[in-house]
Every structure is written in structure tokens, then in C-alpha cells.
Amino acid sequence: PARVVPNGPRNSAARKIRSYFEDVWCATGGVRLGYVNNWSQEGINYYVNNKWNSITRETEPLMDGENEYGNVAFDMMNVAIDPSNPDHVYVSSWDEGVYEILNGEIIEIHNASNSPLVGVNEEFNNEIVLVDGLAFDKDGNLWVTNSKTADCLHVLTPGGQWYSFNFDGAINETFVLGDVIIDSGTDRGDYI
């Protein structure tokens, strides 16, 4: 008998789903109570041009991650689709930082070695970068939350420049941050 495989995602895992017209992107990771890793390796599922695709270790070498301790990218947390180019997508990881994807291929992993994102866990040379929240503002800036550090809010401009905001005294290495919520509904601009 012939095997019939419907056009669907690779798996049923879903933490965050974002859409832009017909395109759908799904981060498949997650965390347990206390923001402890699930150690999910399911990658990223996306629906573009009427077809489901996946970015996993099997399809993309960079899904092995860059920190030498995990040897795989764990826990994809969130998705942000670039409003100026829906083929340009960012996916956060509770391990590796931020994956930048263009046309379904990873073009960069933003982490503690190439951006102001802050790594945690001295046992692992501070290479574990805990990122959840991602959101674009009306000017095309990508806002990113980085947990367990006072430098917990970062922005990546459309020109590729990173800026960081330090909340030392209000937020410290014990704080975990989730979603970025941007309110663009005012005459004075965006509020984070």
C-alpha cells in the first residue's frame, strides 16, 4: 500500500505561532516551570507558498548551534516576522540566542560572541543565551528580551546595529523575561 503524507508540519510541537498573510511560522520549543529547558530539538516549522517546511538539525547545519556545550539548538521560543520583508524571520532560543532566517535558511546566530546578548552559566563559559521575547516596532527595529542579566533589553536596528538597555538595580541575574509587547497606538511613537 502507498503511504499518504498530508501537507502538514513535521510535528505537533508549538510554543509560539506567528503569521503574515498566508505565511505561518512556529517555534517548537518551550520551558518547564521555573523557566527550565524542555530540551526540545524539534526546530522551526513554517508554512510558505502553500507548503510546510522545517528547519532542523537534519536540514540545516547551523541548528547544531554554536555554543560548544549543547551541540544542538534547544527550545525555540518565539518568532518575529520582519514587516518589511516576510521572508526575513527571527526565532529566539532558550539556549543559543536569536536565529536570523532569510528565505528559509539560517544566515546568522546572534549570541554572546557577536552581539550584546548576554550569556549565563559560568560553568559553560557564559555561552548559554536565554532569549524569549521578540517583536518589531513600527520603525522596523527588532526588540529582544534576554533573561538572567541586567542588560535584559536589546534592539537590533534595520541597519544591523545593536543597542542595549541596562536595568541594574531593578532587574538582576535572577530575573526571567518573556514577551516584548509594543504599543504603537499612540501619537508619540512606540512604547515597550
How would you describe each model-predicted region?
Residues 1-192:
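Carboxylate-rich, polar loop motifs that coordinate divalent cations or form catalytic acidic clusters
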